[in-house]
């Protein structure tokens, strides 16, 4: 049976840096660096789901959310992901990681390009994300 999954992620800014989190060894995509976020639960409001995922993965509260872009990808013949990527801001740089992640960095523009995987960088390029972010 075909499956559609809605994933939400956020580029979180604090002091002109972007939060990247590194996946744990047990998780799919192990050791990959990513921006925080995850799946929307049935019946959940979009921003409530985004806030929940960010709190679960980082312990942070965010504000000023703005939808930057949407994308879709077939990850298998029977599974499609719809992804929403937001921009938001953190009040603090004190991150508390969940078991899904093992490290984090408040990244500069150079670190973003070095650490993010190619599909995410391609999405950022397609939507001119690095051009609109006010980061060092």
Predicted region positions:
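A short coil-to-beta-strand element that immediately follows conserved catalytic motifs
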Residues: 61-69
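Active-site-adjacent beta-strand/loop module that shapes the phosphate/pyrophosphate-binding cleft
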Residues: 71-94
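Conserved N-terminal beta-strand and adjoining loop/helix that marks the start
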Residues: 1-19, 70, 87-89
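Nudix hydrolase/Nudix homology domain
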Residues: 31, 99-136
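A generic structural micro-feature
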Residues: 2-4, 32, 76-82, 101
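Structural detector for helix-capping/boundary residues
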Residues: 16, 38, 52, 65, ...
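Short loop segments at secondary-structure junctions
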Residues: 15-17, 24, 89-94, 109-111
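Conserved Nudix-box catalytic region and its N-terminal flanking loop in Nudix hydrolases
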Residues: 14-56
């Amino acid at each position: 049976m075909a499956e559609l999954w809605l994933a939400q992620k956020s580029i979180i800014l604090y002091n002109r840096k972007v939060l990247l989190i590194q996946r744990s060894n047990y998780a799919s995509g192990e050791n990959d660096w990513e921006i925080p976020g995850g799946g929307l639960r049935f019946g959940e409001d979009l921003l409530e789901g985004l806030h929940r995922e960010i709190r679960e993965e980082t312990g942070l509260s965010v504000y000023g959310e703005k939808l930057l872009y949407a994308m879709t990808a077939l990850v298998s013949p029977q599974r499609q992901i719809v992804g929403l990527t937001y921009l938001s801001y953190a009040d603090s740089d004190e991150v508390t990681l969940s078991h899904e992640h093992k490290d984090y960095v408040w990244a500069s523009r150079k670190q973003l390009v070095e650490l993010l995987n190619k599909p995410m960088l391609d999405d950022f390029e397609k939507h001119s994300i690095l051009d609109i972010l006010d980061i060092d």
